[in-house]
Amino acid sequence: GYVCSVESNNLTVATNNLDFLKVLNGALVNNCDGSVLAKILGKIHHEPLDSYIGADIFIKYVKMCRFRQFFLGNTPEVLAGLKSNLSKIDPKINGMRFETLPFRKVDEFDYEGIAKMINDDNPDIIWVSLGAPKQEIFMSKLEPYLNRGVMFGFGAIFNFNAGVGGVKRAPNWMLKLRLEWLHRALEQPQKNIPR
């Protein structure tokens, strides 16, 4: 199965695209990846809801040091930085797979071939970094070919933890005030403000 990290962009796409809504509805779990979204949904459902940020989920699982993990997507530079930094947390990560994917449309991937590569490695967790909404659609198409493991589509976490490429997580004071959305908008305005 797969887990999606749903923020306002994914929700907007799902509202306008029934196929993408089916992808989100097909997930094992959709975590609310934004405090503003949690507040809005809490008001709609008349109960307090909280967000659980994908970057926090990612680092929590890495720090557990007990899962075989597979890291899929992004660039060779980001994957090299990610492997180096995560190996400081869990040295076993040095022996885990970090694989890029060719840049192409989501319908053009060789899902059987990708699944064979993953199945041969036999991971518990498959982290997918292709950016939303592409990674969610990718996971839904890859799922039927996998023998085991849970996929997590948390795109920017590779960049946050790689220490390369200029994409950084918000400073702690912004995280405490739940202003990570503002930090991301200011860091990459052409990408995040239209969302």
Residue ranges and their predicted role:
Residues 38-117, 121:
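Conserved beta-alpha
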Residues 184-195:
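A charged, well-structured terminal subsegment
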Residues 101-106, 147-185:
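Short, flexible loop segments at boundaries between secondary-structure elements
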Residues 83, 136-145:
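Short Gly/Thr/Asp-enriched flexible loops that form oxyanion-binding sites at enzyme active sites
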Residues 1-50, 55-56:
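N-terminal nucleotide/polyanion-binding subdomain common to many enzyme families
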Residues 23-25, 143-147:
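Short, conserved loop/helix-junction motifs that constitute active-site signature segments
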Residues 8-11, 130-135, 157:
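Short glycine-rich anion-binding loops that position phosphate/pyrophosphate groups of nucleotides
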Residues 118, 122-132, 148:
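Proline-aspartate-enriched helix->loop->beta-strand connector
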